[in-house]
């Protein structure tokens, strides 16, 4: 069945006012979907000057260029990793800018936390008005990964029981985070209700502390192992075709990539050669799509065995 657009009947985007009661979403629905993927975008905006001459450190989704920046990533992630059995939801949120987060990294957490407040409001709206009793996958990249960690802590127990899995991509899950009952590290290919976390580097020395320096978990996004078992695969994206090997460093919990011959843009202010933060989704897009589908299948198999067919929030 061809993927179709949202229940609101727009061509690609749901255009609604940015407000607490009705957040603004990109929505792509599929009338055959049995699961939802709720995605939170990474940092796609830069500092800007308002009409009063002030430097602004948060995006403004009423500005077309800010909205377009998020749309570009969101649409790309939808097309790359969302299985045919999932509908896709992603909030347009007034995220912190790249300079606002990384020029002074002591501001990273408080500014991400402020932006995440909108994400939580959007998720609550999604659960109440758009979820329609579907199990759901959470996924966030970089700043969006921070939001996923905080959103996991925000879930009610009943909501947590309906989560297929959470993907924290290009960000860390700390020992403190793991003390929360909704955050449990993935151990294999198809366990459910778990949190998947990975950060990719050529070597552990290329890690960026503010993003992955304190991560307490990691999994290899090719073989989905938490052991140091190498996985060789073909990376074919953007005209590149390289044979790569992904190995989990069980001390740093980082994924070590060997064989990559291309370039990766350095993150402003904190970037290091050999850090593959800009490639966290392209490096593994085929494996991610397959893994999301596997975990969704496992979730629905469990629900069938439990004779549980609907959820109420």
At which residue positions do the language-model features occur?
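Active-site and ligand/interface coordination hotspots across diverse enzymes
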Residues: 20-35, 47
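Positively charged n-region of N-terminal signal peptides that target proteins for export
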Residues: 1-4
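C-terminal motif of bacterial Sec signal peptides marking the signal peptidase cleavage site
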Residues: 16-17
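Active-site-proximal beta-strand/loop segments in catalytic clefts of secreted hydrolases
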Residues: 40-43, 92-96, 141-142, 168-172, ...
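Gly/Ala-rich beta-loop-alpha elbow adjacent to hydrolase catalytic centers
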Residues: 140-144, 148
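Loop/turn elements at helix/coil->beta-strand transitions in domains of secreted/extracellular proteins
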Residues: 33-35, 84-88, 132-135, 161-165
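Active-site catalytic motif of lipid deacylating hydrolases and related acyltransferases
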Residues: 40-133, 264-312
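Surface cap/lid and interfacial helix-loop subdomains adjacent to catalytic sites
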Residues: 115-132, 153-298, 302-311
């Amino acid at each position: 069945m061809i993927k179709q657009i949202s229940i609101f009947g727009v061509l690609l985007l749901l255009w609604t006012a940015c407000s607490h009661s009705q957040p603004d979403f990109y929505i792509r629905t599929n009338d055959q979907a049995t699961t939802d993927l709720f995605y939170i975008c990474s940092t796609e905006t830069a500092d800007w000057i308002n009409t009063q001459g002030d430097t602004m450190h948060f995006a403004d989704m009423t500005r077309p260029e800010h909205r377009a920046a998020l749309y570009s990533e969101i649409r790309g992630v939808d097309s790359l990793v969302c299985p045919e059995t999932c509908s896709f939801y992603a909030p347009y949120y007034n995220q912190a800018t790249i300079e606002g987060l990384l020029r002074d990294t002591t501001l990273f957490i408080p500014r991400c936390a402020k932006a995440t407040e909108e994400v939580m409001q959007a998720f609550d709206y999604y659960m109440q008005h758009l979820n329609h009793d579907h199990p759901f996958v959470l996924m966030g990249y970089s700043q969006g990964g921070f939001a996923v960690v905080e959103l996991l802590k925000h879930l009610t127990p009943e909501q947590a029981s309906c989560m297929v899995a959470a993907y924290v991509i290009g960000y860390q899950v700390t020992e403190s985070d793991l003390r929360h009952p909704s955050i449990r590290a993935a151990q294999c290919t198809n366990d459910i209700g778990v949190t998947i976390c990975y950060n990719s580097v050529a070597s552990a020395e290329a890690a960026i502390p503010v993003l992955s320096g304190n991560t307490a978990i990691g999994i290899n996004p090719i073989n989905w192992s938490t052991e140091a078992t190498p996985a060789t695969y073909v990376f074919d994206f953007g005209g590149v075709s390289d044979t790569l090997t992904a190995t989990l460093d069980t001390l740093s919990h980082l994924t070590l990539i060997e064989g990559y011959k291309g370039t990766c843009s350095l993150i402003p202010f904190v970037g290091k050669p050999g850090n593959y933060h800009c490639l966290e989704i392209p490096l593994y897009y085929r494996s991610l799509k397959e893994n999301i589908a596997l975990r969704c299948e496992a979730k629905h198999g469990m629900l069938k065995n439990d004779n549980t067919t609907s959820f109420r929030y």
